[in-house]
Swiss-Prot record:
Recorded name of the encoding gene: pilO
UniProt name for this protein: Type IV pilus inner membrane component PilO
Coiled-coil parts of chain: none
Cellular component terms per the entry's GO annotation: plasma membrane; type IV pilus
Location(s), subcellular: Cell inner membrane
Organism of derivation: Pseudomonas aeruginosa (strain ATCC 15692 / DSM 22644 / CIP 104116 / JCM 14847 / LMG 12228 / 1C / PRS 101 / PAO1)
InterPro entries: PilO, Transl_elong_EF1B/ribsomal_bS6
Lineage, broadest ranks: Bacteria, Pseudomonadati, Pseudomonadota, Gammaproteobacteria, Pseudomonadales
Keyword flag Transmembrane helix: yes
Organism domain of life: Bacteria
Keyword Glycoprotein: no
Length: 207
């Protein structure tokens, strides 16, 4: 059958005459057209499904790419600053170690007690007590509490406190208590104070 005759037969076909329950009785040209349409529909659906799947994969890969870019940027920044960070940490450790080594050793503590006593006597005070209390160990240093009790005038006490704070070694003052020596008299005052100096703890630093 020629193409012209096929087209002519299609024009003569009434769709209402086609029996859906008996597709085999349909004209050959109609069968071919239906097959072509069904094939095209199947291909279109499959192509659309494939495109949707590819789109989802592309979006997932794009998100993963963005995450990898951020990770790379962070690691690149860390790598660029790693040497500077190491140098800074080394400098801090050296400075901290140097500061700790300025603390008095065991052999220097008696000299510190002499300095405190000399400062008090030079301020016009009378010592009632100056004694070392039990040590308190910390990680990098050891506290050496010193209980001090002195008697003198108000300005003499102030001069003593200022002098102790100015000593070359680190000394901190705590728990001030000032009372008149005689009830009702302010000419002589008794001051009890806890001084703390700090000894270098080389064992703690090595840890």
């Amino acid at each position: 059958m020629s193409l012209a005759s096929s087209l002519e037969s299609l024009r003569k076909i009434d769709i209402n005459d086609l029996d859906l329950n008996n597709i085999g009785s349909w004209p050959a040209a109609v069968k071919v057209i239906v097959c072509v349409l069904l094939t095209a529909a199947v291909l279109a659906l499959g192509y659309n499904f494939h495109l949707s799947d590819m789109q989802a994969q592309l979006e997932q890969q794009a998100a993963e790419e963005e995450t990898l870019k951020q990770q790379f940027s962070t690691k690149a920044f860390q790598a660029a600053n790693l040497e500077a960070y190491k140098a800074q940490m080394k400098e801090m450790e050296e400075s901290f170690g140097a500061l700790l080594r300025q603390l008095p050793s065991d052999t220097e503590v008696p000299g510190l007690l002499e300095d405190i006593t000399r400062t008090g006597l030079g301020s016009g005070l009378e010592f009632e007590e100056i004694k070392l209390l039990p040590e308190v160990a910390q990680q990098f240093y050891i506290e050496l509490p010193i209980q001090i009790s002195v008697v003198g005038g108000y300005h003499d006490l102030a001069t003593f406190v200022s002098g102790v704070s100015s000593l070359p070694r680190i000394v901190t003052l705590h728990d001030f208590e000032i009372k008149p020596v005689a009830p009702g008299s302010t000419s002589k005052l008794r001051m009890s104070i806890l001084a703390k100096t700090y000894r270098y703890n080389d064992k703690g630093l090595k840890k």
